[in-house]
Amino acid sequence: MPAYHSKFDTELKVLPLGNTNMGKLPIRTNFKGPAPQTNQDDIIDEALTYFKPNIFFREFEIKGPADRTMIYLIFYITECLRKLQKSPNKIAGQKDLHALALSHLLPIPGENGFPLNSMYKAPQSKPDEDEMRAYLQQIRQEIGARLCDLAFPDPQDRPSKWWLCFARRRFMDKGLVGQGVNL
């Protein structure tokens, strides 16, 4: 069974994110940032939908810039689930994920700690790096908000075990941050 790839590589002309090979895709969001707005399904919906089946793959063929963005989101969802393991309810989970989204400890492509630097083109200039940081921060904030809605069917209860069971899995045998690093 092949991995699920992003439909945005074939359906949409994907804008490059600065001078890198990641895609700058439109998203549905209320958070401020450089991402174009849309009212339709976006890369975040796709990443959340394909997270569970794709997390089991050790290899993933990148077919375009939208796939690179989706890979980053899958890595980030895993970090979010690790954070949610300690959350007693939805409000605490939202606070934890908002703090994680704004964290400067999360590496971006081109930095030393990023796990797939060989497959991602680093930003060539400071404006490209700033645009990438702002875009990734915006999608991290949005994915945290949507993941809380999915992981907490009851806002007063702990997160769903059907999401938390994936917190220990490692996509492509890698993680966004090294093992043992607490965010």
Curated annotation (Swiss-Prot):
Family per similarity comment: Belongs to the ARPC3 family.
Keyword Transmembrane: no
Name of the molecule in the record: Probable actin-related protein 2/3 complex subunit 3
InterPro entries tied to this protein: ARPC3, ARPC3_sf
Presence of the UniProt keyword Cytoplasm in the record: yes
GO CC annotation terms, alphabetical: Arp2/3 protein complex; cytoplasm; striated muscle dense body
Gene: arx-5
Entry keywords, A to Z: Actin-binding, Cytoplasm, Cytoskeleton
Recorded GO MF terms: actin binding
Task of the protein: Functions as a component of the Arp2/3 complex which is involved in regulation of actin polymerization and together with an activating nucleation-promoting factor (NPF) mediates the formation of branched actin networks.
Localization annotation: Cytoplasm, Cytoskeleton
Highest taxon listed in the record's lineage: Eukaryota
Organism in which the protein naturally occurs: Caenorhabditis elegans
Subunit structure, as described in the record: Component of the Arp2/3 complex.
Chief localisation class: cytoplasm
GO BP terms, alphabetized: Arp2/3 complex-mediated actin nucleation; epithelial cell migration; morphogenesis of embryonic epithelium; regulation of actin filament polymerization
